[in-house]
A protein has these predicted regions:
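Conserved catalytic loops of ABC-family nucleotide-binding domains
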Residues: 132-144, 152
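ABC ATPase nucleotide-binding domain helical subdomain, centered on the C-loop/LSGGQ "ABC signature"
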Residues: 45-85, 130-131
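Helix N-cap at the start of a conserved alpha-helix in ABC-type nucleotide-binding domains
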Residues: 123-124
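Catalytic Walker B motif of ABC-type/P-loop ATPase nucleotide-binding domains
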Residues: 112-116
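Hydrophobic anchor residue at the start of the ABC signature
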Residues: 101
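Conserved beta-strand-loop-alpha-helix hinge in the C-terminal portion
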Residues: 165-187
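Helix-to-loop junction immediately C-terminal to a conserved catalytic motif
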Residues: 15
Length: 187
């Protein structure tokens, strides 16, 4: 759906961050990658541990490697102890999304909720993040809220939202799938 169609609201309801006005939502345990990546004035380690408080340093490095952020962090004098946020290291938009991806990967949940996971990233960074999600998301169910072709192209099914309602549904290989994909914003 387009901007304002209700995609992010639907995702927030499924994630349990908003209460539906009517009816009820039941969801599997899930990992939630929202549009906003919160960066706390703390160490990189503690920013990652928000996703999995019991994670070992080895697990943190594995998630950073999988997210494409490890080499940059290894180059920092303090490594995982590098301070982030005000008074510490600032991260670019691409690095923030990769940090969010590392947090996602630290959670072993069977469902991923991804709200515009590459919005605002340059094309090369977006392709890399999506390739990593595709490779690491095997065996999980994904729900992606997007208006971008590059993100929707990963889907097996497309739901088209307008004004908060599902207007259409297409399965990969069906007659309308390609047209629905083409109607989304190109890279």
């Amino acid at each position: 759906g387009s901007s304002g169609a209700g995609k992010s609201t639907l995702m927030a309801v499924i994630a349990g961050e908003l209460t539906p006005r009517e009816g009820m939502i039941r969801s599997q345990p899930h990992a939630w990658l929202s549009q906003r990546t919160d960066l706390f004035q703390d160490s990189l380690r503690d920013n990652l541990l928000l996703a999995s408080p019991e994670a070992t340093d080895a697990s943190l490095w594995h998630a950073l490697e999988a997210a494409g952020l490890a080499s940059g962090i290894r180059g920092l004098q303090a490594g995982l102890d590098t301070r982030l946020g005000e008074g510490g290291l600032g991260l670019s938009g691409g690095q923030l999304r990769r940090l969010a991806l590392a947090r996602l990967l630290l959670q072993p949940h069977p469902l991923w909720l991804l709200d515009e996971p590459t919005e605002g990233l340059d094309a090369a960074t977006a392709r890399d993040v999506l390739a990593r999600l595709d490779a690491l998301g095997a065996g999980r169910a994904w729900l992606i809220a997007t208006h971008l072709q590059r993100e929707a192209a990963l889907a097996d099914r497309l739901l088209v939202l307008r004004s908060g309602r599902v207007e259409a549904e297409y399965s990969r290989g069906s007659a309308g799938f390609g047209a629905a994909l083409a109607a989304l914003r190109p890279d």
